[in-house]
Amino acid sequence: MSSSVVAETVPSGSGSWFSHFKATLVLGIPLIGAQLAQLGIHTTDMVIVGQLGAEKLAAMVLAGQFFFVVFIFGSGFSVAVVPMVAQAYGQGDATSARRSLRMGMWVAIAYWLLALPIFFNAERILVYLGQNPNVAALTGHYLAIAKFGLLPALLFYVLRGLVSAIGRAGIILYVTIIMLVMNGLMAYVLVFGHFGLPAMGMNGAAVVAVIVNAFSFIFIVAYVQTREETKKYELFVRFWRPDWHALFEVLRLGLPISITILAEVTLFAAASILMGQIGTVQLAAHGIALQLASIAFMIPLGLSQAATVRVGVARGQGDFKNLIRASIMIYAIACGIALCGGILFAAVPEFLAKWFLDPKLPEAAEVLAYASSLVVIAGIFQLVDGIQAVTAGLLRGLKDARIPAMLALISYWPIGLALAWTMAFPLGFGGRGVWFGFVIGLSTAAVLLTVRFVLLVKREMKTAR
């Protein structure tokens, strides 16, 4: 990592609280912006498709969750490339960086091929899981097209690892904003049929998703192939040649990261399945509340990525004073933002929900009323979700991935999902019970991960003395 990036992420000297605040924002804002823009793409699709009715919106919720679960597990291996490339970059070793990136792309291609049968059988899987056959059919048609966008999306994630490692994360924000604008304009045209083009409905949104993901990959390839600081890596020279050490390193680092991310994401996907079993209205309302919560989550997620860099650099320097101060500041920023978001969700839930469904539709009143009650619970959910996300980032900065993955699995599934099902069905709370299970599961994760981080820092401080 270049000295300029280190200077931005870990303040020199005494490391005042203000310098930590400033450094966190300098690193975190572009990452947060990129996350928000990425989520905005799916949010735009929901807003547009929601105008077609509750059934189409419910199908869009399932399709988005289905695609995201498959994507996010594969992206964990792409995330693993970042520290490998960063270390090679710091050593001036372009060859090792190129090999890591190449093997990261190999893994992405292999993963996409392995995932194709899941997409081909999406409708059958959803019907088996108790979803409404009509909703499952709409979802299956969408995913039959969207599967072609998975590969460029994964490859883009690998190459953004190089861009981040050399301190050029701003380009990720720029390309994601372009993707957001392209997606909104093209989806509006193809879904409803404007400028002489036929109305394609949900399938139009799927076509646009493929185009936008392909554009992002082509854009970042052009960037790394033409910029002086990146074209020296010669990423596609002898692309066919394997490097088994780099390949196994990507797999070794990526698996626990993928498991950690997937454990939380699949909790939400499973909750959508539970909601679908309760009813179409509840599933549509759940999708609205979940999308709002997901938008808010992009802020602690961006801060989590910043936390990994800042704590990792401080630990490498053996500077525990700045490590602790950086951690406290990131916690403070995350909690402050979550509290503001929670107040907003509690104050105007119906206003927020109306963005996702045309109030004039016959079923809109029932969906919006139910969604408003879930949005209030989502306000509480924000705080604990933000804490556990930031703490996971701090632990990655200490290169601690295996134990957090285990803690996440325990918190999300045996605790969170089990309680969600129990409160929804045996206890009779319905969809609200699912969300209460969310809150308890993520609260457990927040506590366990925070305890793990505190104990680990104390142990490493003791060892360093």
UniProtKB/Swiss-Prot annotation:
Bilayer-spanning residue ranges: 61-83, 104-126, 141-163, 170-192, 202-224, 251-273, 283-305, 326-348, 368-390, 403-425, 435-457
Keywords, in A-Z order: Antiport, Cell inner membrane, Cell membrane, Ion transport, Membrane, Transmembrane, Transmembrane helix, Transport
Gene Ontology MF term list: antiporter activity; xenobiotic transmembrane transporter activity
An individual GO BP term: monoatomic ion transport
Membrane topology summary: Multi-pass membrane protein
Major site of localization recorded for this protein: membrane
Coiled-coil regions listed: none
InterPro entries the record matches: MATE_fam, MATE_MdtK, MdtK-like
Key word Ion transport present: yes
Subcellular location field: Cell inner membrane
Gene Ontology cellular component list: plasma membrane
Pfam families per the UniProt record, alphabetical: MatE
UniProt record similarity statement: Belongs to the multi antimicrobial extrusion (MATE) (TC 2.A.66.1) family.
PANTHER family, A to Z: FMN_FAD EXPORTER YEEO-RELATED, MULTIDRUG RESISTANCE PROTEIN NORM-RELATED
Function recorded in the entry: Multidrug efflux pump.
Descriptive protein name: Probable multidrug resistance protein NorM
Native species: Agrobacterium fabrum (strain C58 / ATCC 33970) (Agrobacterium tumefaciens (strain C58))
